[in-house]
Amino acid sequence: MTPEEVLEEFRSAGALLQGHFILSSGLRSPTFLQKMTIFSDPARTERLCRALAEVITARFGRIDIVVSPAIGGIIPGYETARHLGAKAIFVERDPGGPFTLRRGFSIPAGTRAVIVEDIVTTGLSARECLASLKDEAGEVVGAACLIDRSGGRGAIGLPLLSLVTLDIPTYAPDALPAELAAIPPVKPGSRALPKP
């Protein structure tokens, strides 16, 4: 699947949005990738994750376990693992705490794991996921995502593969360009949503 075909999947699903968005990192952006619109379509998700599995296999070879950060990474992690013939597990947060492996999940000695994310903006979730795996016996060989919107700057401490790398600008809330500041912001993501 070419980068343009990946972007067309997002465009045709109405998942490539323009406006003024508050990202889960707190940064602001004129572009938002609404991945849950993608993941609500099993056929579209299957196509994208099959392509991601092919990229992972070409770079890393055998993968035994796919680890994803909850919640956003669970669907692409599971579907990518299915195409890799691997086990799918996830890390999750205790409220206000770091990611941890729970539910009896582990990465045993001799296994090769890859972290699978949905969209990488700063790399924070992938870095936190990797940190939560430091005491596991198996080897975490790299990470992969559908779209790296950091322009390749989302360093996580491992090789990061993506189907598409975009350089989508992000801004601190106090450093917005005038044209973005003129648009009322919306927070379409899920991290730290205000309580109703």
From Swiss-Prot:
Cofactors: Mg(2+)
Catalytic reaction list: orotidine 5'-phosphate + diphosphate = orotate + 5-phospho-alpha-D-ribose 1-diphosphate
Binding residues annotated for orotate, in chain numbering: 121, 149
Record bears the keyword Transferase: yes
Pfam families the UniProt entry points to: Pribosyltran
Keywords: Glycosyltransferase, Magnesium, Pyrimidine biosynthesis, Transferase
Domain of life: Bacteria
Entry EC no(s): 2.4.2.10
Residue positions binding 5-phospho-alpha-D-ribose 1-diphosphate: 117-125
GO terms (BP aspect): 'de novo' UMP biosynthetic process; pyrimidine nucleobase biosynthetic process
Any one Gene Ontology molecular-function term assigned to this protein's record: magnesium ion binding
Protein's pathway: Pyrimidine metabolism; UMP biosynthesis via de novo pathway; UMP from orotate: step 1/2
Signal peptide bounds: none
Protein family: Belongs to the purine/pyrimidine phosphoribosyltransferase family. PyrE subfamily.
Function statement: Catalyzes the transfer of a ribosyl phosphate group from 5-phosphoribose 1-diphosphate to orotate, leading to the formation of orotidine monophosphate (OMP).
Assembly, per entry: Homodimer.
Protein name per UniProt: Orotate phosphoribosyltransferase
UniProt source species: Methylorubrum extorquens (strain PA1) (Methylobacterium extorquens)
